[in-house]
Amino acid sequence: MKFVLLFGVLLVTLFSYSSAEMLDDFDQAVEDELLSLIEKEEARAKECTPRFYDCSHDRHSCCRSELFKDVCTCFYPEGGDNEVCTCQQPKHLKYMEKAADKAKKFGGKIKKWFG
C-alpha cells in the first residue's frame, strides 16, 4: 500500500511539473507574439497635433483631451481667402468633460464623508 501511495505522489508530481513546463512555453510564445505586435504599433504611431495648432496637413492627427479626441476645425478668417484648420474641442464635449470632472470630485467628497 505504501508503494502505491508513493508511486501515486511521484506520478502526480511529475505530471504537474510537465504541465507547468508546457504552460510556461505557451505563455512565452504568447508573450513574444504580443511584444511583436506592440512594437509594430509603436512604429506606426505618430505625433498628435496639440490643441489650437495647425492640422491642415493631417485632419485626423489631433490629440486627445481627458475624455474625448479633439476635432480638426477649418474656417476662413475674417477678410482672408486662405482656409485655416486648427485642432479644437467642440463646446458640447468641453461641457461634458467639466460635468464629468465635477461628478468625480463630488463622488470623492461623498466617499470621504461616508467612507
Curated annotation (Swiss-Prot):
Q: Which UniProt keywords apply?
A: Disulfide bond, Knottin, Secreted, Signal, Toxin
Q: Which residues form the propeptide?
A: 21-44
Q: Which GO terms describe its cellular component?
A: extracellular region
**Where does the protein end up?**
Secreted
Q: Provide the leader sequence positions.
A: 1-20
* Alphabetized Pfam families for the sequence: Toxin_35
Give tissue specificity per the record.
Expressed by the venom gland.
Keyword RNA-binding attached: no
Does the keyword Secreted belong to this entry? yes
User: Could you tell me which cysteines form disulfide bridges?
Assistant: 48-63, 55-72, 62-87, 74-85
Q: InterPro entries per the record?
A: Spider_toxin_CSTX_knottin, Spider_toxin_CSTX_Knottin_CS
Write out the transmembrane intervals: none
Q: Which GO terms describe its molecular function?
A: toxin activity
Q: What main location does UniProt list?
A: secreted
Q: Which family does this protein fall into?
A: Belongs to the neurotoxin 19 (CSTX) family. 01 subfamily.
Which comment does the entry carry about domains? The presence of a 'disulfide through disulfide knot' structurally defines this protein as a knottin.
Q: What is this protein called?
A: U3-lycotoxin-Ls1a
Native organism: Lycosa singoriensis
